[in-house]
Amino acid sequence: MTEKRLAQISVVLSTIIIMTYAFLSSYFLNKPLNLSSADLMYFALSNLLSLSLPFVCAWFPYLFVRPAAVTGSALSAFGLFLFFAITSSTMDDPKGAAAIWVIYFFWLIGAALAGVYPALFKPHFFTKTATRALVLSALFTVVVSFIIGFLISRIA
């Protein structure tokens, strides 16, 4: 399997799972509230945008580096999504669960900003091999983006 094909598969499968989670959670969490169809659809679309847009922003800058970097960033961003989805679903407090998704949003916006450095400057340590690109993009998505997201949340 080629490097590009692996990147495409990881991005498509992760996006499909995130979209499915967004629509199913929107429907089943609001069904007892007896919302109208228009309100339910509005909530589902806003939920979809708030979950999938940061995910896309996290791996998009790595398109300009190498496909293995896209794979590493997409899989680590998807791992973060799974962690936050499981954490928010096990919380009893709805405000706490909402705060978890705000942290997810800031973390992946930080990942998008962290991905700008390798995309613009294409450092040699990042582009030398596919394995390095995969591991470093995953580390940038998890560690560096946490620092940037934390700083953004403190400023905002």
Curated annotation (Swiss-Prot):
Top-rank taxon: Bacteria
Transmembrane region(s): 7-29, 42-64, 69-88, 98-120, 133-155
Annotated Gene Ontology cellular component terms: plasma membrane
Subcellular location: Cell membrane
Membrane topology: Multi-pass membrane protein
Keywords, comma-separated and alphabetical: Cell membrane, Membrane, Transmembrane, Transmembrane helix
Disulfide cysteine pairs (residue numbers): none
The keyword Cell membrane is annotated on this UniProt entry: yes
Primary localization class, coarse: membrane
Tagged with keyword Acetylation: no
Name of the molecule in the record: Uncharacterized protein PM1189
